[in-house]
Amino acid sequence: EQEVTALVLDAVAKIRAKSNTPILLVEHAGYSNAPTNAAQYELYTRLNRGQRVAFDKLMNEGTPNLFYLTHDQLGFSPDSWVDYVHPSDLGAQKQADAVTAKLKEILNR
């Protein structure tokens, strides 16, 4: 979790050093077997927590043009996967729709 936080903080700092372009951080979509596999659930939720800690820290510091898309906003369902991790066509469409909606929100602000 702390490693993810550090990596996100570093990545945003490197981008901000050169550009004020909007940055959209997107949470891990999870795994299809996470509801029945505690290890898989813990893995992706830990990664997402680490990223969220970095986002919150950056927002508290006043980092401009930083945005966030949550796991829940991605809206994956059981049919969104072809296996444990790779999205099906439906999953890819859900991800594209969620990212598109967020990008429209960012660009129209």
Model-found features: residue ranges?
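Alpha-helical cap/lid subdomain in secreted, periplasmic
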Residues: 1-109
